[in-house]
């Protein structure tokens, strides 16, 4: 029976949202995995049973992770299915990031000995009597999982066990997962993995992959400690209706389960394992064969070039304004000595007496700036560590753990920035300000997250955060982040208000009638287009890693895009700010925040488009979860980009009004 899927089988991998390569030295190239073990994940040596010692193990443990599907947002633990279960074994401890991502790694009943090959070894047999309600429920859950194409995720020596097959253009794709089984519809259409064999042909029938051929490749250690190191673990899923279940021989027809089957159904789970020495692959680069099979590296470079063109265009525009227009304006303004000349002032200098007038809703703006600063620093530091290889796919859950810990510890700059600007806006309710900074934005995110978690609890999904973890998150928030925010706010309020280069008039200047293009809404809508143009290709891969369970590892690209996004948001906001000041509209504070923050609205529109055009998600719960988590990402992105725009515009306005002579 052939086990190679044709090109029509979708290329899918596990969700490893580990958004790690050195920015310059290891931007993805011919060997994208070479930087993964730089921080020092220690290798494990394996020996045969006769040579085992404390430094060299003989037993190879296979762990199982949660099962997931691209047609459902709901992952499930391995134990939720009626598969063969481990009789003993210690469950690996999981970090905060793994728990938040829904990973549930458990020991499996599959036990191997290094270099000891086995053929058609029986693991267990499951028997179902369809007239029994409990058995029927288990069988129906198994059928539903095959219908939704749920995938196993197995782990050997911290490496995913991969299913490698050819996709389009004879390219090999190594999927770090394999399906439970597949389904032939009542019209004879083969769904998902059922296309791999002509033996899967019975209508309205499920075929379960109850046998796996596992091949483990190893590299012999030439120097130092004796033994070998595992460099790859691959498998081929197969289906057999074993003639003699007690002594299976892994031959015969496929294991089919008719949708209308009744009576007794027996499923025997078996495996075969072989070992192969691999001289060309070193342990430090053992992820390469998986990562090199991932497509779209050339598209990533196109994305970078596209973004750089936008940055160069904006930089040219800003340079022209700063070096020519502003330089001439400032020179002309500074040469005006007579009252008659002063009366002929026009453009942005006319509003010098109102440019630093406190904005409306200054409390809310300062709170947004504090939270945005927290997110901005967190993102930069997280991506920096990712580029150094600390947050690679081999270090499971590290990315999310790092982000959460950084967010908690960055309460101080959030409180400081919020307090500093609120005081500069003339605010006096410092207690309200620090409380809102501590609880408003984090509270919205947590409330959304908690509602999503209730849905996951109700569905029995492994992605549901345990009660103890929720308590731990609340403890981090209330016991560490909030006090740090108060400390930052204390120092922010203690300092003098920000000194502006020009005084503010007592009577506000009337803003003249604005043209369509200088009105607030058109400018805000236009301001988000260019920043979004820099990230939308990268956004596709990030959404794929989250919702389509594809591996993301190109942190070098992502860090470059992050820098480009910061520059683009800054320059686009400065450009529009200048045009509005020339139109004598001095309400720049909220406008600068919303101009770059509007990029998040384009993010939301793209996420909606992605849901309907790219995903195969079905079910009300999965749809609610998708848009619930999307709203969290949109809010975080809004605060992140809006803060960049405000700081850029604040610097620009302070700079230009500090170099003109004002009586």
From Swiss-Prot:
Q: What is its main location?
A: membrane
Signal peptide range: 1-28
Q: Which InterPro entries does the UniProt record give? A: EMP70 (IPR004240)
User: Which ranges of this chain reside in the Cytoplasmic compartment per its record?
Assistant: 322-374, 420-437, 488-522, 576-591, 653-663
Any Pfam family the entry gives: EMP70
**Its membrane topology, per UniProt?**
Multi-pass membrane protein
Localization terms from the record: Endosome membrane; Golgi outpost; Cytoplasm, Cytoskeleton, Microtubule organizing center
Task: Please provide, in alphabetical order, the Gene Ontology terms of the cellular component aspect for this entry.
Answer: endosome membrane; Golgi apparatus; membrane; microtubule organizing center
Lineage top rank: taxon: Eukaryota
Q: Which UniProt keywords apply?
A: Cytoplasm, Cytoskeleton, Endosome, Golgi apparatus, Membrane, Signal, Transmembrane, Transmembrane helix
GO biological process terms, alphabetically, are: ceramide metabolic process; glycosphingolipid biosynthetic process; protein localization to membrane; regulation of heparan sulfate proteoglycan biosynthetic process
Segments passing through the bilayer:
301-321, 375-395, 399-419, 438-458, 467-487, 523-543, 555-575, 592-612, 632-652
Looking at the keywords, is Transmembrane helix present?
Answer: yes
The residues on the Lumenal side of the membrane are 29-300, 396-398, 459-466, 544-554, 613-631
The protein's job, in short, is: In the intracellular compartments, may function as a channel or small molecule transporter.
Query: What's the family?
Result: Belongs to the nonaspanin (TM9SF) (TC 9.A.2) family.
Name the UniProt record assigns to this protein: Transmembrane 9 superfamily member 2
- Organism, by scientific name, is Rattus norvegicus (Rat)
Q: Which gene encodes it?
A: Tm9sf2
């Amino acid at each position: 029976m052939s086990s190679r899927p044709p090109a029509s089988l979708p290329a899918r991998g596990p969700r490893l949202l580990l958004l790690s390569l050195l920015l310059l030295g290891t931007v993805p190239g011919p060997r994208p995995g070479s930087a993964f073990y730089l921080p020092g994940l220690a290798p494990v040596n394996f020996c045969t049973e006769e040579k085992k010692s404390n430094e060299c193990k003989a037993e190879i443990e296979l762990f199982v992770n949660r099962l997931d599907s691209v047609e459902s947002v709901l992952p499930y633990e391995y134990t939720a299915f009626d598969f063969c279960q481990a009789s003993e074994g210690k469950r690996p401890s999981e970090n905060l990031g793994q728990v938040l991502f829904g990973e549930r790694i458990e020991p499996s009943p599959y036990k191997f000995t290094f270099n000891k090959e086995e053929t058609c070894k029986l693991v267990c047999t499951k028997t179902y009597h369809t007239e029994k309600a409990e058995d029927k429920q288990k069988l129906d859950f198994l059928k539903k999982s095959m219908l939704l194409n749920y995938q196993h995720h197995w782990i050997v020596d911290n490496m995913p066990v991969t299913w490698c097959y050819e996709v389009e253009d004879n390219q090999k794709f190594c999927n770090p997962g394999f399906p439970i089984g597949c389904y032939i519809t009542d019209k004879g259409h083969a769904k998902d993995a059922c296309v791999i064999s002509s033996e899967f042909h019975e209508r309205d029938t499920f075929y379960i992959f109850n046998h796996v051929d596992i091949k483990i490749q190893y590299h012999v250690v030439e120097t130092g400690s004796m033994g070998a190191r595992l460099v790859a673990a691959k498998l081929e899923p197969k289906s057999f209706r074993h003639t003699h279940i007690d002594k299976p021989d892994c031959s015969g027809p496929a294991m089919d389960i008719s949708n209308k089957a009744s009576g007794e159904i027996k499923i025997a789970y078996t495996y075969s394992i072989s070992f192969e020495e691999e001289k060309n692959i070193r342990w430090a680069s053992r992820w390469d064969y998986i990562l090199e099979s991932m497509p779209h590296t050339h598209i990533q470079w196109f994305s970078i070039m596209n973004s750089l063109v936008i940055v160069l265009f904006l930089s040219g525009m800003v340079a022209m304004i700063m070096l020519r227009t502003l330089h001439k304006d400032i020179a002309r303004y500074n040469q005006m000595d007579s009252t008659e000349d002063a009366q002929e002032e026009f453009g942005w200098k006319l509003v010098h007496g109102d440019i630093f007038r406190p904005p409306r809703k200054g409390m809310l703006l300062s709170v947004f700036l504090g939270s945005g600063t927290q997110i901005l620093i967190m993102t930069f530091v997280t991506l920096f560590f990712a580029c150094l290889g600390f947050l690679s796919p081999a270090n499971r859950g590290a990315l999310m753990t790092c982000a959460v810990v950084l967010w908690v510890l960055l309460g101080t700059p959030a409180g400081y920035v919020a307090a500093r600007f609120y005081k500069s806006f003339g605010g006096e309710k410092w207690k309200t300000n620090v409380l809102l900074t501590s609880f408003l934005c984090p509270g919205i995110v947590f409330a959304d997250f908690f509602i999503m978690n209730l849905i996951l609890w109700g569905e029995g999904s492994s992605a549901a955060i345990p009660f103890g973890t929720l308590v731990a998150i609340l403890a981090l928030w209330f016991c560490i982040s909030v006090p740090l925010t108060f400390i930052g706010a204390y120092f922010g309020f203690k300092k003098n208000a920000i000194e502006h280069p020009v005084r503010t008039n007592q009577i506000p200047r009337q803003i003249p009638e604005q043209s369509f293009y200088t009105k607030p809404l058109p400018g805000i809508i236009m301001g988000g287009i260019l920043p979004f143009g820099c990230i939308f290709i990268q956004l596709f891969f990030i959404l794929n890693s989250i919702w389509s369970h594809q591996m993301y590892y190109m942190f070098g690209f992502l860090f470059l895009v992050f820098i480009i996004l910061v520059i683009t948001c800054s320059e686009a906001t400065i450009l529009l700010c200048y045009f509005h000041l020339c139109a004598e509209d001095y309400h720049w504070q909220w406008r600068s925040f919303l101009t770059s923050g509007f990029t998040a609205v384009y993010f939301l529109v793209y996420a909606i488009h992605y849901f309907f055009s790219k995903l195969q998600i079905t079910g009300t719960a999965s749809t609610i979860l998708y848009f619930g988590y999307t709203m969290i990402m949109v809010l975080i992105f809004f605060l992140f980009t809006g803060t960049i725009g405000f700081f850029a515009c604040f610097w620009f306005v302070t700079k230009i009004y500090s170099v003109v002579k004002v009586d």
